[in-house]
């Protein structure tokens, strides 16, 4: 995993150049937005169990056959696995948001996820819907538009962070498609 600083340094080192210009400005912006980034991650972490359970519940409410016999999350064991997997995905999205880099999400969470779910017979549509609900909920927390928040989110415009986290969820959706 390379954070924003490591990426810039690695790039400059590869060119045998000093860090400067646009790279330095990008790092200055990353640092100045740091408190918003940390507060946004804190909002996700503080509300993680609600985000995960509401996302999975929303998926089940929209498709009740999933909890019927032979459904994708029929047994307690399958439901627990579904909740666990959603929590893991949310955790890696929060790591990516904190570092400003999606490589940890891609390398440690998404690599082989689709194949694993396919081999277990997990329905792809349910996964996609859970991720979609989770994305909307997290963006609501970051932009301070959620009714359920336990903590306040940062003041000011967080639309760039909301867009960034939306991109991480889009990577998850693409990996599962």
Curated annotation (Swiss-Prot):
Membrane disposition: Peripheral membrane protein
Sites where the protein binds (2R,3E)-phycoerythrobilin 1: 18
Location of this chain's protein in the cell: Plastid, Chloroplast thylakoid membrane
TM spans (from-to): none
One record GO biological process: photosynthesis
Residues that bind (2R,3E)-phycoerythrobilin 3: 82, 84-85
Positions of (2R,3E)-phycoerythrobilin 2 binding: 28, 35, 39, 144, 154, 156, 158
UniProt PTM comment: Contains three phycoerythrobilin chromophores and one 15,16-dihydrobiliverdin chromophore with binding of the phycoerythrobilin chromophores mediated by both the alpha and beta subunits.
Main location: plastid
Binding residue positions for 15,16-dihydrobiliverdin: 50, 54, 61, 129, 148-149
Keywords, ordered alphabetically: Bile pigment, Chloroplast, Chromophore, Electron transport, Membrane, Photosynthesis, Plastid, Thylakoid, Transport
CC annotations in GO: chloroplast thylakoid membrane; phycobilisome
Subunit structure of this chain's protein: Heterotetramer of 2 different alpha chains and 2 identical beta chains which form 2 alpha-beta heterodimers within the heterotetramer. The two alpha-beta heterodimers are rotated to an open configuration in contrast to the closed configuration found in other cryptophyte species due to the insertion of a single amino acid, 'Asp-65', in a conserved region of the alpha chain. In the open form, the central chromophores are not in physical contact but are separated by a water-filled channel.
Other comments on record: The light-harvesting system in Cryptophytes contains phycobiliprotein complexes. Unusually they are composed of either phycoerythrin (CPE) or phycocyanin (CPC) but never allophycocyanin (APC), with only one type of biliprotein being present in any one species. Unlike cyanobacteria or red algae these proteins are not arranged into higher-order phycobilisome complexes, and they are found in the thylakoid lumen.
Protein name: Phycoerythrin beta subunit
